[in-house]
C-alpha cells in the first residue's frame, strides 16, 4: 500500500479560479503523466471542486507529481491516500456532504483509466473498493438523504406540499440562473410540463429549450398561472410581478380545485404581499429552501461517524488485499529470477554437451543451479529486517522438513 500516492487540490484549499488553473486540459492527460513519471498506474479525478491524481509507483516522486497540479497541492501516501479516496467516494469530502454526483465521477475516472490502459492491479483494487463502499455508505447510512442544494430543496418542498410531481405543471417566471437551477431540479424529478415566461420572449424560448419546455408570453401570465401547479419566480424586477389580483383571477380560471405552490426566490420579492393569504395558495421563499437545506445537511453530518466506521473497516480489508497482491508479485518476481538462472545454466550445459561427458555436464548443471538458487535466497533473506528474516528462516525450515 505504501507504493500508492494521491496528490491534489480541492475546494478546501483553493478558490474556483485556482482550481480552474490546476485542471488538466484533457482527462486523457493521464497517459502523459504515466509516461513522464514512469508510473505503474494512474487515475485522474477532475470535478468542479477537485483535481486529484492517484498514482501507483510514484512514492519517490510524489512531490514532483503534486507540483504538476499546483504549488499548494497536498500529498497523501499509502493508507492515507486510500482513506482519502474512500472519503471522496462516500461524499465526506464534498462541499455538500453525502452528495451523489461524486460517486458517479469517481466511477467515470476509473472507467476512463481502464479504457486508456493506465490502471494497474493495486489501483483496480482500491478504486473498485471505493466505488462499492460509496454505494454501501449511501445504502447503510443516511449520509445522502434529504435535499442540501437550493434546487433539490425546492423539489422536496414541492413534494411535501403537492405529493408526486409526475402529473404537475411548472411555470418558471424569469430566465435567470437561480430560477433555471430550481426549475431543472423539478424537471429532473419528472414533472408533466414546464412553462417559461420572461419579459424578453427570446430568453424564455432559450430557457424553455434547455428545460424541454414551452415558452409563453409574459403578458399572458394570468392564463399560465391558471394552468400551473408550481410557480418558480426569479426575475430581477425591482417590484412584484405576481399580484394578488392576478392570482385570484388565475384561480377563477382554473378548471380544477387544487392548490398552487409559488416559490419566490427573487430579491427583492416577485410576489406581492397578501398573495400568501389567498386560499389554495402556498407561498415559499428562498429562505424556506435554505432552512430545508440546512436541516438536511445537519442530519447528514450526524451520519459522518457511521460512514467513517465503514471506511476504517474497508481500509483494513483493502490493506490485506494489497498485501496479498504484493506477496503474489514477490513470488512472481522470484519465479522469474529462478527461471532466468535456470535458462542461463541450461544454455551453458547445452553448449558443453556437444563435447563433454553427458553425466558430468548434468551433474555440473545441477550443482551450479542449486548453488545459484541458494545464493539468491540467502542474499535476499539476509537483507530482510530482523523480524522478517526470522520468519523467512522458519518458512525455509518448514519447507525442508516437508521435503524430507
Swiss-Prot record:
It catalyses: (S)-4-amino-5-oxopentanoate + tRNA(Glu) + NADP(+) = L-glutamyl-tRNA(Glu) + NADPH + H(+). PROSITE patterns: GLUTR (PS00747). Belongs to the glutamyl-tRNA reductase family. The gene is hemA. Optimum pH is 8.1. This is Glutamyl-tRNA reductase. NADP(+) binds at residues 174-179. Inhibited by heavy metal compounds, Zn(2+), and heme. Also competitively inhibited by glutamycin. Substrate binds at residues 47-50, 94, 99-101, 105. The keyword Oxidoreductase applies. Catalyzes the NADPH-dependent reduction of glutamyl-tRNA(Glu) to glutamate 1-semialdehyde (GSA). In the absence of NADPH, exhibits substrate esterase activity, leading to the release of glutamate from tRNA. Pfam families: GlutR_dimer, GlutR_N, Shikimate_DH. The lineage of its organism: Archaea, Methanobacteriati, Methanobacteriota, Methanomada group, Methanopyri. One of its GO terms (molecular function) is NADP binding. Homotetramer. The record marks 84 as: Important for activity. The active site is at 48 (nucleophile). Its EC number is 1.2.1.70. Pathway: Porphyrin-containing compound metabolism; protoporphyrin-IX biosynthesis; 5-aminolevulinate from L-glutamyl-tRNA(Glu): step 1/2. GO terms for biological process: protoporphyrinogen IX biosynthetic process from glutamate. PANTHER family: GLUTAMYL-TRNA REDUCTASE (PTHR43013:SF1). It comes from the Archaea. Optimum temperature is 90 degrees Celsius. Keywords: NADP, Oxidoreductase, Porphyrin biosynthesis. CDD domains: NAD_bind_Glutamyl_tRNA_reduct.
Amino acid at each position: 500500500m505504501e507504493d500508492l500516492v494521491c496528490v491534489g487540490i480541492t475546494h478546501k484549499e483553493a478558490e474556483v479560479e485556482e482550481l480552474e488553473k490546476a485542471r488538466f486540459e484533457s482527462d486523457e492527460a493521464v497517459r502523459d503523466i504515466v509516461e513522464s513519471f514512469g508510473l505503474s498506474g494512474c487515475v485522474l479525478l477532475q470535478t468542479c471542486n477537485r483535481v486529484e491524481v492517484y498514482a501507483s509507483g510514484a512514492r519517490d516522486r510524489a512531490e514532483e507529481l503534486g507540483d504538476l497540479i499546483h504549488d499548494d497541492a497536498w500529498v497523501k501516501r499509502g493508507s492515507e491516500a486510500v482513506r482519502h479516496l474512500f472519503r471522496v467516494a462516500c461524499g465526506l469530502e464534498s462541499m455538500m456532504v453525502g452528495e451523489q454526483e461524486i460517486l458517479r465521477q469517481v466511477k467515470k475516472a476509473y472507467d476512463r483509466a481502464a479504457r486508456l490502459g493506465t490502471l494497474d492491479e493495486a489501483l483496480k483494487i482500491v478504486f473498485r473498493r471505493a466505488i462499492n463502499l460509496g454505494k454501501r455508505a449511501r445504502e447503510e447510512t443516511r449520509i445522502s438523504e434529504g435535499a442540501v442544494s437550493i434546487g433539490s430543496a425546492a423539489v422536496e418542498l414541492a413534494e411535501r406540499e403537492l405529493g408526486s410531481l409526475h402529473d404537475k405543471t411548472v411555470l418558471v417566471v424569469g430566465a435567470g440562473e437561480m430560477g433555471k437551477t430550481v426549475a431543472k431540479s423539478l424537471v429532473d424529478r419528472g414533472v408533466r410540463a414546464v412553462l417559461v415566461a420572461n419579459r424578453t420572449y427570446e430568453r424564455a424560448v432559450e430557457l424553455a429549450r434547455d428545460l424541454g419546455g414551452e415558452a409563453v408570453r409574459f403578458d399572458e401570465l394570468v392564463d399560465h398561472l391558471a394552468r400551473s401547479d408550481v410557480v418558480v419566480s426569479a426575475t430581477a424586477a425591482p417590484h412584484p410581478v405576481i399580484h394578488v389580483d392576478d392570482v385570484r383571477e388565475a384561480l377563477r380560471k382554473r378548471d380544477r380545485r387544487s392548490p398552487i405552490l409559488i416559490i419566490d426566490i427573487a430579491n427583492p420579492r416577485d410576489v406581492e404581499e397578501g398573495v400568501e393569504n389567498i386560499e389554495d395558495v402556498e407561498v415559499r421563499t428562498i429562505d424556506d429552501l435554505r432552512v430545508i437545506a440546512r436541516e438536511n445537511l445537519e442530519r447528514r453530518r450526524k451520519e459522518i461517524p457511521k460512514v467513517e466506521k465503514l471506511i476504517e473497516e474497508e481500509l483494513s480489508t483493502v490493506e490485506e488485499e494489497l498485501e496479498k497482491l504484493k506477496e503474489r508479485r514477490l513470488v512472481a518476481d522470484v519465479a522469474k529470477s529462478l527461471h532466468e538462472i535456470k535458462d542461463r545454466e541450461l544454455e551453458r550445459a547445452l553448449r558443453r554437451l556437444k563435447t563433454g561427458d553427458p553425466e558430468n555436464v548434468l551433474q555440473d548443471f545441477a550443482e551450479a543451479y542449486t548453488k545459484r538458487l541458494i545464493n539468491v535466497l540467502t542474499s535476499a533473506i539476509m537483507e530482510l529486517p530482523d523480524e522478517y528474516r526470522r520468519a523467512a528462516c522458519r518458512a525455509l525450515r518448514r519447507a525442508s522438513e516437508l521435503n524430507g
